Amino acid sequence: MSDISKASLPKAIFLMGPTASGKTALAIELRKILPVELISVDSALIYKGMDIGTAKPNAEELLAVPHRLLDIRDPSQAYSAADFRRDALAEMADITAAGRIPLLVGGTMLYFKALLEGLSPLPSADPEVRARIEQQAAEQGWESLHRQLQEVDPVAAARIHPNDPQRLSRALEVFFISGKTLTELTQTSGDALPYQVHQFAIAPASRELLHQRIEQRFHQMLASGFEAEVRALFARGDLHTDLPSIRCVGYRQMWSYLEGEISYDEMVYRGVCATRQLAKRQITWLRGWEGVHWLDSEKPEQARDEVLQVVGAIAG
């Protein structure tokens, strides 16, 4: 697309970053200054009743600065990148029609990628194929299926852990249904995002600072009633660890504690470690991201001013 045709597109802002990097706080500050409306880009914040462990903005913050695409699914329901793209495009169109600018804030990089580049035409899930895969896993173990994936799609196998049955079974399912690998199909993108996007990433300057923030926030969540929140989900009886909601960082570890699999101290340790691993994956995504302007979360006023400097001209 030429620069001239790109300039004629409506404007949008991406504010990306790892967990515990201060994205939401900066977005709320920007909302006070710029003609923007916030859209959440977070695969955990979509779930109702999952507030403390996801660091969801509180009621007071949401009253002052509404966020779209929060609390749109029950934890028993799935929500795909395709679902997100559809919903986000509808919200962006609504915001643009009102003469304002969509500000998309979050850390689910797969959602940002799907929105920006479009989605490859993957086949829909097939219950029969999935059942066959799960039967094979029950008989031979997931390690055996991972070796099978390595033979047909080594690129996907290198990316998917043998202990991740959800992604492993999906990669095999795609191959069995279409005869093409997940890697082949995902190299074919769909429609690009019809917006002129200004992209920002916020993170602390050092990994140690981010690790400190993550540990501090996990303990704050525990002090705020995270265990009681997960106990309420646990007591429902219809939720389990195969669901994306309960596999969210922190929830999975607390669930193991409630099931008596691990001690409280082990839950805290694993929860902090899993959150750090998530942050590492998010930063790895962002380092390979083109056209992103990095902001230092330890200098919030400077970060805000840098965004205003870049975005101010388009918001005037």
Curated annotation (Swiss-Prot):
Substrate binds at residues 19-24. Keywords: ATP-binding, Magnesium, Nucleotide-binding, Transferase, tRNA processing. ATP binds at residues 17-24. The keyword ATP-binding applies. The record marks 108, 130 as: Interaction with substrate tRNA. Transmembrane segments: none annotated. Its EC number is 2.5.1.75. The keyword Glycoprotein does not apply. It catalyses: adenosine(37) in tRNA + dimethylallyl diphosphate = N(6)-dimethylallyladenosine(37) in tRNA + diphosphate. GO terms for molecular function: ATP binding; tRNA dimethylallyltransferase activity. InterPro entries: Dimethylallyltransferase (IPR039657), IPT (IPR018022), P-loop_NTPase (IPR027417). Its cofactor is Mg(2+). GO terms for biological process: tRNA modification. Residues 42-45, 166-170, 247-252, 280-287 are annotated as: Interaction with substrate tRNA. Pfam families: IPPT. Catalyzes the transfer of a dimethylallyl group onto the adenine at position 37 in tRNAs that read codons beginning with uridine, leading to the formation of N6-(dimethylallyl)adenosine (i(6)A). Monomer. Belongs to the IPP transferase family. This is tRNA dimethylallyltransferase. It comes from Shigella boydii serotype 18 (strain CDC 3083-94 / BS512). The lineage of its organism: Bacteria, Pseudomonadati, Pseudomonadota, Gammaproteobacteria, Enterobacterales.
